[in-house]
A protein has these predicted regions:
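Alpha-helix capping/hinge segments and adjacent helical runs
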Residues: 2-5, 10, 90, 183, ...
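C-terminal amphipathic alpha-helical interaction region
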Residues: 100, 458, 474-596
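A short core secondary-structure module
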Residues: 188, 192-246
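Amphipathic, small/basic residue-rich leader segments at the start of a protein or domain
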Residues: 1-125, 149, 372, 580, ...
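A glycine-rich, basic-preceded beta-loop-alpha segment at the flavin cofactor/substrate interface
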Residues: 197-199, 236-252, 257, 264-295, ...
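A structural-propensity feature for long, helix-poor, extended segments
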Residues: 132-134, 143-146, 150, 440-443, ...
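Internal maturation/activation junctions in enzymes
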Residues: 79, 130-131, 142-184, 368-387, ...
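Glycine-rich cofactor-pocket loops
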Residues: 29-32, 62-75, 287-298, 312-354, ...
C-alpha cells in the first residue's frame, strides 16, 4: 500500500530560512503566524493528511462516487466523516478573512497545508479547494448581501462551492457558451442550460452547494463580452439564512474518468434555476478569473503534490527491491542482490524527481508570499510588484508544475517495473490522478499562449524585466562566492537563454503570431527551468550559510547535492528550448491539414 509523509522539514526551511516570512509581520495575519504557531499548524496538518486523508485515497479510487435515481450523489466511504473533520478543524478557512469566520493566516501557510492534503488525497482535497476559490470570487465581486449570505457558511465547510464554465460545445472558448439567464421582476434570474466536467457538482459532504455559473443574459453581446456570472445555490436560502426549497439544478450524470474517482465530476442541468448576478452584467469573466487564478495555483500545487507522493513511494521501493548487483561491486554481499537504489540510472531518476519537487515547493512558497503581499500590503508599490509577479508566474506554475508533475509520476511508476503497472501498488493511481492537472483550469498549451501573448508584453514587459533583474542581481551579488559558483554560473547561463528567447519573440512574433504559438510551450518550460534554478540558488545560499554557522546536517548536505544535480543534469535543457524557439514556425505550419 502507498505511503506518505508530509515534508514538514522542507516547508519549515523555506518559510523560516529561505523566505524568512517573519520579516512580513507588518502584513495582516502574519504576526499571528509565529514560528511556534506555524510549527503547530504544520504538525497537525501533516497528521491529518497522513492519518486521515491518505488512507482514504485508495478507497476513493476504488469506490468512486455514486449517483442515485433522484439525482443525489454519495461520496466514497469515509469521505463525509473526513470532510467534517477538516471543516470543524478550521482547515478550509485557514487564510480566509476573519470577518467571514476564517483565521486570516497567510496564504503562504495555507498553500503548504494544501500540498499535504493534495499529496495524501487529491480527489478529496478538491472539494475544499474549489469552495475556497468560489469564496474568493464572491468576496471580490459579490454584493454585500451575497457575501453575508454565502461566504461564512462556505468558510465553515457547512456549504461547498463550485465553478461552472464548460459546456459540451465550449471549453477554452467560453464565448461559445449557450447557458442563458432570464431576468425576473424581483431582480433574480432564471438560469437554463447544461454544464459538463463540474468538479464536486453534487455530493453528500455538505448541506448546500453554491454554484458559480457563467451564463448569457438575453440580448447580451455575442462572444466573451456577453458573459455574466451568477450565484446559484443548490438549495435556496431564506432571508434569515435558513434553507428553503430545492432549486432547479440537478446532477444529470457523473463523468466516468481516468482518475480522481473520489471527486464527483458531474454533468449539471440548470432548468430555470434561480440565480443572482455577481458583479455587473456582461462582465462575468472578471469574477470568474478571480476563481480561475486561485484554481490554477491550486492545480499547480496538485502537480507538485502528486510528484512528491509518487517520489516517496518510489524511494521506499528502490531501497527494498533487490535486483542485480552494483556496477562497482556488491553493496549488500549478505543478500542475494543489491537494492536497486545502488544503480546510477535509478538514482538519476529519483534525483530528477526530487530536484523538481524541492524547487517547485520553493516556487509555490515564493509565489504564495507574493499573493499575501498583493492582497495585504498597504504599500501600493509593493502591491503592484507582487501583482505583477502573480500575473507572470501563474501560467508558468500551472503549466510547468503539472507537466513535470505528471512526468514524474510516470518516472516513479517506472521504478517499480511491472509491479508499478499493478493497481494494488498504488503507483498507477498517482499517474491517473496527476494527468487531469495538465488539462483542467486552462489546458497547459493555453497557459503557454497566455504567457507569451499576454503576460510577457503586459505593461511594456514590466513583470518579466523585474524577474530578469531580480535573478541577475542575485547572480551579481553571489557570483564571486566560490561555494556558490556551481549554482550561480549555470543559473546565469540559463537566464541568458531565457533573455535571448524573449528578445527573439519580441522581434519575430508581432508580425507573425504563429511564431509565438509555435514557441509558446518551449518558452514556458524554459521560463520554469530558470525559475527553478533561481530557487535552487537561493536555497543553496541559505544552506551554505547555515553550514558555515552551525555545521553540516544530513538535510543541508542533501539539499546542496540535489541542487548541484539540478544545475548539472536538468538545467542544460534550456539550450534545447532556446534552439526550438529560434527555429520559428515554418515546419510546424507548412503542412496542409489533410497531410496529417
Amino acid at each position: 500500500m502507498p505511503i506518505y509523509k508530509a515534508p514538514v522539514e522542507d516547508v519549515n526551511f523555506l518559510l523560516n530560512d529561505v523566505f524568512q516570512i517573519d520579516r512580513y509581520d507588518n502584513l495582516p495575519g502574519f504576526s499571528d503566524a509565529s514560528a511556534d504557531v506555524r510549527e503547530a499548524i504544520l504538525g497537525e496538518a501533516a497528521k491529518l493528511a497522513e492519518e486521515v486523508l491518505q488512507p482514504l485515497n485508495r478507497v476513493g479510487d476504488l469506490e468512486g462516487c455514486a449517483r442515485h435515481d433522484d439525482g443525489s450523489v454519495t461520496t466514497p466511504k469515509g469521505f463525509k466523516e473526513a470532510f467534517k473533520q477538516v471543516a470543524e478543524g478550521g482547515w478550509l478557512g485557514l487564510s480566509a478573512p476573519a470577518e467571514y469566520g476564517g483565521q486570516g493566516l497567510p496564504v503562504t501557510l495555507s498553500q503548504a497545508v494544501n500540498e499535504f492534503q493534495c499529496s495524501a488525497n487529491m480527489a478529496f482535497s478538491m472539494y475544499g479547494g474549489l469552495t475556497m476559490g468560489a469564496t474568493a470570487a464572491l468576496i471580490v465581486h459579490g454584493k454585500p448581501e451575497q457575501k453575508k449570505m454565502f461566504v461564512p457558511k462556505m468558510v465553515a465547510g457547512e456549504w461547498t462551492g463550485t465553478m461552472n464554465l464548460t459546456e459540451p460545445q465550449c471549453g477554452t472558448d467560453l464565448g461559445l457558451l449557450r447557458t442563458k439567464a432570464v431576468k425576473q421582476a424581483d431582480g433574480s434570474y432564471k438560469i437554463s442550460g447544461t454544464k459538463i466536467f463540474i468538479s464536486a457538482g453534487e455530493h453528500d459532504l455538505a448541506e448546500n452547494i453554491i454554484h458559480l455559473v457563467l451564463a448569457r443574459i438575453e440580448g447580451a453581446p455575442a462572444g466573451i463580452k456577453g458573459v455574466s456570472l451568477f450565484v446559484v445555490p443548490k438549495i435556496l436560502v431564506n432571508g434569515d439564512g435558513s434553507l428553503g426549497a430545492r432549486n432547479g439544478v440537478t446532477c444529470g450524470s457523473i463523468e466516468h474518468k481516468m482518475g480522481i474517482h473520489g471527486n464527483s465530476t458531474c454533468v449539471m442541468n440548470y432548468d430555470g434555476a434561480t440565480g443572482w448576478l455577481i458583479g455587473e452584467e456582461n462582465k462575468g469573466m472578471q469574477g470568474m478569473f478571480v476563481m480561475m487564478n486561485e484554481a490554477r495555483l491550486g492545480v499547480a500545487v496538485q502537480g507538485l503534490a502528486q510528484s512528491e507522493v509518487a517520489y516517496q513511494n518510489a524511494v521506499a521501493y528502490a531501497r527494498d527491491r533487490l535486483q542485480g548487483r552494483s556496477l562497482s561491486g556488491p553493496k549488500a554481499p549478505d543478500k542475494p542482490a543489491d537494492p536497486i537504489i545502488v544503480h546510477p540510472d535509478v538514482r538519476r531518476t529519483l534525483l530528477t524527481i526530487r530536484a523538481f519537487n524541492e524547487a517547485a515547493r520553493a516556487m509555490v512558497v515564493w509565489t504564495a508570499l507574493k499573493s499575501d503581499v498583493a492582497h495585504r500590503s498597504s504599500d501600493p508599490k509593493d502591491r503592484q510588484e507582487a501583482d505583477d509577479h502573480m500575473g507572470l508566474m501563474t501560467p508558468v506554475m500551472k503549466g510547468v508544475l503539472t507537466d513535470v508533475g505528471f512526468s514524474n509520476a510516470v518516472l516513479a511508476q517506472q521504478m517499480y517495473g511491472g509491479h508499478g503497472y499493478i493497481a494494488e501498488q498504488g503507483m498507477e493511481q498517482f499517474v491517473r490522478d496527476a494527468r487531469i492537472a495538465m488539462i483542467y483550469e486552462g489546458a497547459n498549451g493555453i497557459q503557454a499562449l497566455d504567457l507569451v501573448g499576454r503576460k510577457l508584453p503586459r505593461d511594456g514587459g514590466r513583470a518579466v524585466m523585474a524577474f530578469f533583474n531580480e535573478v541577475a542581481t542575485f547572480a551579481k551579488e553571489h557570483g564571486g562566492d566560490e561555494a556558490m559558483k556551481p549554482y550561480v554560473a549555470p543559473m546565469s547561463t540559463a537566464l541568458g537563454h531565457l533573455q535571448q528567447a524573449t528578445t527573439w519573440l519580441m522581434q519575430n512574433a508581432m508580425m507573425k503570431p504563429d511564431n509565438a504559438g509555435a514557441a509558446a510551450t518551449d518558452y514556458m518550460q524554459l521560463f520554469g527551468l530558470v525559475t527553478f534554478a533561481y530557487m535552487w540558488a537561493r536555497m543553496a545560499k541559505v544552506a551554505l550559510d547555515k553550514i558555515a554557522a552551525s555545521g553540516a546536517t544530513p538535510y543541508l548536505t542533501t539539499k546542496l547535492v540535489t541542487g548541484r544535480f539540478f544545475m548539472e543534469r536538468m538545467l542544460p535543457e534550456t539550450s534545447v528550448h532556446l534552439a526550438r524557439i529560434q527555429t520559428g514556425c515554418a515546419t510546424t505550419m507548412e503542412l496542409a491539414a489533410e497531410a496529417f
